[in-house]
């Protein structure tokens, strides 16, 4: 599959797409969560996440608020047959033209489409969009055990700029 041809970016419509992006958001969170949280089987993690309305509402509020900014990327990616193959959410931050940055909050490629260069395509797309819309920097985060995402970031020329720590309390 040529990743830059025959792909369609469709703006997220929360009435139509909220179930899809909530499911993928939960999968992304699990893949990027800390080691102790990932000891929980995914189905239990998912059940806990979806039982907390605050989690869902917080995420939907954040994406809704970010979409008020026309620079934000909030796209569902579809193939030439109209099948959903992933999604990308990249809000912008900063009002000072000398310090505007884009933040790759979520990038997701459906399992059946992985290994085809789509994640690289989406990251490249986000970078070009960010440059075109005045960002000086693009940021993206991942979990400490999400090796495939770390490799993608390294391949795309991203460098680590911060560490986060946690302590399991007993």
Q: Model-derived features: where do they sit?
A:
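Conserved beta-strand-loop-alpha-helix junction that forms the acyl-donor binding cleft
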Residues: 114, 140-150, 166-168
């Amino acid at each position: 599959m040529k990743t830059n041809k025959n792909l369609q970016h469709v703006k997220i419509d929360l009435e139509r797409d909220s179930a899809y992006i909530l499911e993928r958001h939960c999968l992304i969170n699990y893949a990027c969560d800390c080691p102790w949280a990932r000891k929980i089987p995914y189905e239990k993690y998912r059940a806990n996440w979806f039982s907390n309305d605050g989690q869902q509402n917080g995420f939907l509020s954040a994406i809704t608020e970010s979409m008020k900014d026309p620079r934000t990327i909030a796209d569902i990616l579809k193939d030439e047959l109209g099948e959903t193959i992933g999604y990308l959410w990249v809000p912008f931050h900063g009002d000072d033209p000398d310090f505007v940055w884009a933040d790759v909050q979520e990038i997701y490629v459906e399992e059946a489409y992985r290994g085809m260069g789509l994640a690289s395509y989406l990251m490249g797309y986000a970078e070009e969009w960010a440059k075109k819309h005045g960002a000086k920097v693009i940021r993206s985060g991942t979990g400490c055990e999400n090796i495939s995402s770390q490799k993608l970031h390294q391949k795309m020329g991203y460098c680590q700029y911060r560490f986060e720590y946690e302590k399991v309390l007993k």
